[in-house]
Design a protein with these regions (language model features):
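Walker A (P-loop) ATP-phosphate-binding motif of ABC ATPase nucleotide-binding domains
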Residues: 2
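Hydrophobic anchor at the beta1->P-loop junction of P-loop NTPases
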Residues: 5
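The conserved Walker
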Residues: 9
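Conserved lysine of the Walker
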Residues: 13
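Conserved substrate/cofactor phosphate-moiety recognition/catalytic segment
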Residues: 18, 22-62
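Short, well-ordered alpha-helix to beta-strand connector turns
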Residues: 61-62, 81-82, 144
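NTP-dependent small-molecule kinase module
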Residues: 125-181
Length: 181
């Protein structure tokens, strides 16, 4: 099973991905860990080559969960996955979570450092995100037919359990069963 979880910053993608990975006994990957070099004190974008290699390494695995905010570099993963879980969380809640993340990073000294400027930029990005993602997913029929929207863990589990029966085209269901043997 290959699952992509997409949603804006502060939606809870990482939390949901970890719970799903535990429930389904498969690996999880944060796109931020591919996109950003997280070894320093500041956020620095990885090279296109490093990002591409990271994506290819994930695609080669039999099953995975990848979570991230939409970026054009995610496209190979979105095309490869069996199901796209789209998180829908109100902007006010995402804003609260992003501010909590910033305050927690101040207390814990987490690296790379979350700055107030970065946090404000994330809130602004989160505000614009929904329309951009909807436009992107709806413009590609190969992707739009895989999308199931949800807003909490139990709905995500239910979407996965029923997705292959009710929400995905027969061709995808057949491909998923064929891959399993």
């Amino acid at each position: 099973m290959k699952i992509c979880i997409v949603g804006p910053s502060g939606a809870g993608k990482t939390t949901i991905a970890k719970k799903l990975a535990e429930e389904l006994k498969i690996s999880t990957h944060a796109f931020d860990e591919i996109y950003w070099n997280l070894s320093g004190t500041e956020f620095v974008k990885n090279s296109e080559e490093t990002i591409s290699v990271g994506i290819k390494q994930i695609i080669l695995q039999d099953s995975w969960i990848v979570e991230g905010a939409y970026d054009k570099r995610l496209l190979p993963l979105l095309l490869e996955c069996s199901i796209i879980l789209k998180m829908e969380v109100p902007l006010y809640l995402r804003t609260i979570r992003l501010l909590q993340r910033y305050l927690k990073s101040l207390v814990t000294g987490k690296r790379p450092k979350e700055t107030l400027k970065n946090t404000i930029e994330l809130i602004q990005f989160s505000h614009r995100f929904d329309k951009r993602l909807e436009k992107f997913l709806s413009s590609n029929t190969q992707l739009s037919r895989k999308v199931i929207s949800f807003n909490n863990f139990s709905k995500a589990i239910n979407a996965i359990q029923t997705g292959f029966k009710n929400n995905l085209p027969d061709s995808l269901i057949h491909n998923e069963r064929t891959k399993k043997g």
